[in-house]
């Protein structure tokens, strides 16, 4: 048995179209604006467009593997078999933020169709060959991303993008409520796609759980979770019925199964999108897919699948099925589809050759340039900006300015931090402060005491007890112009969620060449514990993992006056350069 499965799958589509073209029987032509099926929202014209976008995606995968044979490409994780996600790309708007699965080729082609003049196929090829002309990552990593299409690039860390997608969905209404301008419409929704193996990860479950939790609290959460189910995690099969059993009957989460013909998938997706946009609630779209050609080009699929299993998978190729649907419905003739396929192959391979001639990053300085932007003049200017007019600031602090306070508790490190947080909330309407117990209680060490009362629950609020979700909210909020100051209650708790900093927040500017950013300050009480208490449950000195993350700033104040100045500088650094600042607060020095 030959294992050049790319050639076999390509030949199967060619064979079907040739046989159909030779057949004497042909259905009556379907008018371009007629539905593909009675009662369906998918027209013949749109179905043909979808098929063309699917063909482009498939040929990008073919080109990546062809170029790899001569060491001219560096990414062979394909979208082959997942091309029905094209329907999601076509039905969402380009100002609906999208956090995408790595098999999103067809989705991106359809999304880009909405932007005249865009060149998504060539852009993708530039990423595959690691060219510095790649408009999103400039050759640093092959990602699906685009600033004009509102697709922040994602890492391939399993499930790590679900919390921040949830965070952005939560923050849409919050920003509008606070009067913070975004570039998104009021009815925007968030798309978050992932695989069936991914959804078992604790990080994925955190994002979905927090979305449901928000609905229970009566908060808007307009997010469409799309699980692209190919029933396989590299070599490990997903048990039959697992996804439906796990997510099909959860309260506060709508579930839709998208399978069957392309028009059936279209109509199911349309209903899910309509629900999320109208109800401002989350939905879980279960999209049936098939994985062709292994996990990636380096994956020897025959080592864990029989020849019969591989052939059975290939028979379920969505392009083959969709071509048959177009021909049998009269939406397109075999000759039209053959011409479209030949033209797509020629265009994509020509573009691939052109991409290999484009420049690449040559120096370390070029590669790391967007990792840690630093503009000290701008930072100082932001930090030195007058806090408020004198009368307003005096009123904010209850008639006594913090620098003139004589009460001992106001001069402690905790007291100075409280005053500095009040100043930042007072002068920056985009600042929000949140975490476990920071609102009504005022923090377990009273550092945020009274701030919710002064600034309201829209800006100072409590979260559920999940550090991953707290950092996800911070990232999502920062993506749309808010400036989050999030609290992780103890340093010991940060390690549960550290990849949200390491793999996600700290890499966004790097992978997007500075086009996307997530400025934030993360307050973390830690180090030596308060006198009279001990044990390993809350206190932690482990900051090595933080110091190992490129681009992250770590600040550790030791005195009250330093703490206030450092916090002001941290917020200014986040605002000016989009930086992620970890602000470690020594518990033993609070009071």
Residue spans for each PLM region:
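Conserved acidic/glycine
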Residues: 1-85, 91-92, 293-455, 465
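Cofactor-binding active-site loop characterized by glycine-rich and histidine/acidic residues
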Residues: 59-62, 66-223, 233-254, 534-536, ...
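Thiamine diphosphate
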Residues: 83-86, 150-224, 232, 259-275, ...
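Short beta-strand segments
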Residues: 99-102, 159, 165, 169, ...
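Conserved thiamine diphosphate
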Residues: 182-186, 239-271, 314-342, 511-576
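Conformationally flexible catalytic loops at phosphate/diphosphate-handling active centers
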Residues: 196, 563, 569-591
């Amino acid at each position: 048995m030959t294992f050049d499965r790319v050639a076999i799958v390509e030949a199967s589509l060619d064979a079907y179209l040739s046989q159909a073209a030779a057949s004497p029987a042909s259905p009556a032509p379907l008018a371009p604006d007629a539905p593909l099926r009675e009662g369906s929202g998918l027209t013949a014209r749109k179905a043909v467009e979808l098929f063309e976008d699917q063909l482009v995606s498939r040929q990008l995968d073919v080109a990546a593997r062809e170029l790899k044979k001569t060491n001219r490409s560096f990414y062979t994780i394909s979208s082959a078999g997942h091309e029905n996600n094209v329907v999601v790309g076509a039905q969402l708007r380009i100002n609906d933020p999208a956090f995408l699965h790595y098999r999103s080729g067809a989705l991106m082609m359809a999304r880009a169709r909405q932007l005249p003049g865009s060149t998504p196929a060539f852009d993708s090829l530039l990423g595959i060959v690691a060219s510095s002309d790649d408009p999103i990552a400039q050759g640093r990593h092959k990602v699906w991303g685009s600033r004009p299409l509102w697709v922040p690039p994602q890492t391939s860390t399993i499930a790590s993008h679900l919390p921040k997608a949830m965070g952005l969905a939560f923050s849409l209404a919050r920003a509008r409520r606070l009067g913070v301008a975004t570039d998104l419409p009021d009815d925007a929704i968030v798309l978050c796609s992932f695989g069936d193996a991914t959804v078992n990860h604790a990080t994925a479950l955190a994002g979905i759980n927090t979305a449901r939790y928000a609905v229970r609290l009566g908060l808007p959460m307009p997010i469409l979770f799309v699980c692209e189910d190919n029933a396989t995690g590299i070599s490990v099969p997903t048990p039959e019925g697992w996804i439906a059993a796990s997510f099909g009957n959860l309260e506060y989460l709508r579930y839709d199964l998208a399978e069957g013909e392309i028009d059936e998938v279209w109509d199911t997706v349309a209903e899910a999108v309509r629900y999320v946009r109208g109800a401002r609630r989350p939905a879980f779209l279960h999209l049936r897919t098939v994985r062709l050609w292994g996990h990636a080009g380096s994956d020897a699929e025959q080592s864990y699948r029989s020849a019969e299993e591989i052939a059975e998978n290939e028979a379920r190729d969505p392009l083959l099925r969709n071509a048959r649907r177009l021909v049998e419905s009269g939406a397109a003739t075999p000759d039209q589809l053959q011409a479209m396929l030949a033209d797509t192959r020629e265009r994509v391979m020509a573009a691939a050759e052109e991409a290999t001639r484009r420049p690449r990053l040559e120096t370390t300085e070029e590669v790391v340039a967007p990792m840690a932007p630093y503009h000290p003049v701008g930072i100082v200017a932001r930090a030195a900006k007058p806090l408020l007019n004198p009368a307003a600031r005096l009123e904010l602090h209850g008639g006594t300015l913090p620098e003139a306070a004589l009460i001992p508790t106001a001069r402690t490190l905790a007291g100075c931090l409280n005053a500095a947080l009040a100043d930042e909330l007072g002068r920056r309407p985009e600042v929000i402060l949140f975490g476990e117990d920071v609102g009504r209680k005022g923090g377990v060490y009273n550092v945020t005491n009274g701030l919710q009362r002064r600034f309201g629950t829209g800006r100072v609020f409590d979260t559920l007890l999940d550090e991953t979700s707290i950092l996800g909210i911070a990232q999502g909020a920062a993506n749309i112009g808010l400036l989050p100051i999030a609290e992780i209650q103890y340093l010991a708790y940060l390690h549960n969620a550290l990849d949200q900093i390491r793999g996600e927040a700290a890499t966004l500017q790097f992978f997007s060449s500075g086009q996307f950013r997530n400025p934030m300050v993360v307050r973390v009480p830690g180090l030596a514990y308060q006198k009279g208490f001990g044990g390993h449950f809350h206190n932690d000195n482990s900051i090595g993992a933080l110091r190992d993350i490129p681009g992250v700033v770590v600040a550790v104040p030791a005195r009250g006056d330093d703490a206030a100045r450092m916090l002001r500088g941290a917020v200014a650094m986040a605002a000016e350069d989009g930086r992620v600042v970890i602000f470690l607060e020594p518990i033993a020095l609070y009071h």
